[in-house]
Design a protein with these regions (language model features):
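Glycine- and acidic
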Residues: 17-18, 70-78, 202-214, 235-245, ...
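Internal maturation/activation junctions in enzymes
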Residues: 219-241, 267-363, 434-435, 453
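Structural signal for hydrophobic packing residues in well-ordered secondary-structure cores
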Residues: 10-18, 36, 40-44, 73-76, ...
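Catalytic alpha/beta core of large soluble enzyme barrels
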Residues: 132-133, 226, 230-231, 301, ...
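A glycine-rich phosphate-binding loop feature that marks nucleotide/adenosyl-phosphate handling sites
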Residues: 1-5, 31, 52-60, 106-118, ...
Length: 490
């Protein structure tokens, strides 16, 4: 949110205003950082910059970002604009409420928990905001070729001291210069392909698979299947194939949470709900990591394993803060049915087959096909019409009966902080993210309520939220439009 054109960015999907300055078919997102959120809380000043003067901010996070940002604020030689952080935050939330975007993603939360922080940085998420993997844009290097045929390459903005004693960016060096006593014969640009994240997704149906024994049996097979997809897939772009083969990233998620809760007569937002999903997600996390480690013995480690958090025995739950841990206490601070220390030793010894493991996709189509509820969401209503890329589909919640009716709480009837807390419990066990929608009726909407929801999401360590879905209480609209979701995540 430090881009000097952020106000125009926030207006991209508005229906009013100059149409040439709108982009209705794009899905913008904001990459929010801790420093901005802290200044919103403190009602402090926020500085906007020209991105060409501050390119390095895109790859920094945490204390490194804050330190560099504050240095740039003091730099009088670059273009900047000062605004009230709270006013900008209000505009962000207003745009989010009016248009459903920009999606809000939390840069520092994502990168702090990045299992492959040794090999790059997470710069963004995907359309459905559950994929968090290292990416890198295509770029050019400057290649100096000497008369002998030898060559050396530098990044375009990397400072080079030529023999005349002048220090300048590599892109400013010419064939009239010399390096190390060698005249430069030719200066060329060489293209370097970046890294593109890939979604290799599957979901465990919690309405059928929700006990320790069932998860122990099913998850290793799911991990093996997803790993096979990487090798068997068709890749239209070579750099996508290279990235996928190098990181071997998969995204095992869940669907059917609402059905599982209803059939077990558990109300949304109760402590029983929190305990149940904590138990289930722990089992999925443990078995996913263990299965990937076993595959590493059989097929080999992924190329970037050495130096990763996996190699150091650091797992997703190690990033959970005290507030999240205190949401669930299953007997002792971290009571568990699994031997986590043994698994850490195993992973450090055997390695991992896959660099990224878990991500919860929206599953708006496959959940209907399999006869369960969508992903991790409460139901839209007990009966409604689902509009997605397949058309308009009549839907009734699974196994609706007098016994389950009360436990299928419609999403718009819930306090949305419950969804945030439940997501934080899941996030404790997920190395990537979740596609998390927020549901608000107009009679409940207020700036204070929206601020409470999204501030809580940031504080509890969530990496993203998806759509902010709003509905007027007077309008009897039984159609839930999901047609704008990513095809791969449906």
């Amino acid at each position: 949110p430090w881009h000097i054109d952020i106000n125009d960015f926030l207006d991209l999907k508005k229906n009013s205003g100059e149409e040439r300055r709108r982009a209705h078919d794009l899905f913008p997102a904001l990459w929010l950082n801790d420093l901005f959120m802290e200044r919103v809380q403190a009602d402090d000043i926020w500085t906007l910059f020209d991105p060409y003067d501050t390119r390095e901010l895109a790859t920094l996070f945490g204390e490194d970002f804050s330190s560099r940002y504050e240095e740039l604020e003091k730099n009088e030689s670059i273009i900047k604009e000062k605004v009230k952080a709270k006013n900008l935050w209000k505009k962000i939330l207003t745009s989010y409420f009016e248009t459903g975007s920009p999606f809000l993603c939390f840069k520092d939360n994502a990168n702090r928990a990045n299992p492959n922080d040794h090999y790059g940085v997470i710069r963004s998420s995907n359309l459905c905001t559950e994929i968090f993997q290292n990416t890198e844009p295509n770029h050019y290097k400057i290649k100096f070729i000497f008369e002998s045929g030898e060559s050396i390459s530098y990044e375009e903005d990397e400072l080079v001291t030529v023999d005349s004693g002048i220090e300048k960016p590599a892109k400013k060096v010419t064939a009239l210069d010399s390096l190390g006593g060698l005249p430069i014969y030719v200066v060329e640009k060489e293209k370097v392909d970046g890294a593109t994240a890939v979604c290799n997704l599957a979901s465990v149906n919690l309405s059928r698979i929700n006990t320790k024994e069932e998860i122990d049996r099913i998850v290793p097979t799911a991990v093996r299947c997803l790993d096979n997809v990487i090798d068997l897939n068709f890749y239209p772009i070579e750099k996508v194939k290279r990235t996928n083969m190098r990181s071997r990233s998969i995204g095992l998620g869940v669907m059917g949470e609402a059905q599982m809760l209803a059939e077990q007569e558990i109300m949304w937002g109760t402590q029983e709900h929190f305990d149940k999903i904590d138990e289930v997600m722990e089992a999925i996390c443990y078995n996913t990591i263990s299965a990937s480690s076993d595959l590493a013995v059989e097929k080999g480690q992924y190329a970037e394993f050495q130096g990763s958090k996996w190699s150091r025995g650091i797992f997703p739950q190690d990033h959970a803060n005290a507030e999240v841990i205190n949401l669930v206490d299953r007997g002792g601070l971290f009571a568990s049915a699994y031997e986590w220390e043994e698994l850490r030793t195993k992973v450090k010894s055997q390695g991992m087959r896959n660099g990224y493991l878990m991500a919860v996709a929206p599953t708006s189509s496959i959940s209907i096909l399999t006869g369960t509820t969508q992903a991790i969401e409460p139901v839209f209503k007990r009966k409604w019409f689902e509009e997605n890329l397949s058309g308009l589909i009549p839907v009734v919640v699974p196994n609706l009966s007098p016994d389950t009716y009360a436990y299928y709480t419609p999403a718009y009837d819930l306090n949305q902080t419950i969804l945030i807390k439940a997501a934080a419990i899941r996030q404790k066990w997920i190395d990537q993210g979740q596609s998390l929608n927020i549901f608000i009726t107009l009679d409940k909407a207020s700036g204070k309520y929206l601020n409470e929801i999204y501030m809580l999401a940031w504080k509890l360590g969530l990496k993203s939220t998806y759509y902010l879905r709003s509905q007027s209480p007077e309008v009897k609209n039984d159609v839930e439009d999901r047609s704008m979701e990513c095809v791969g995540c449906q």
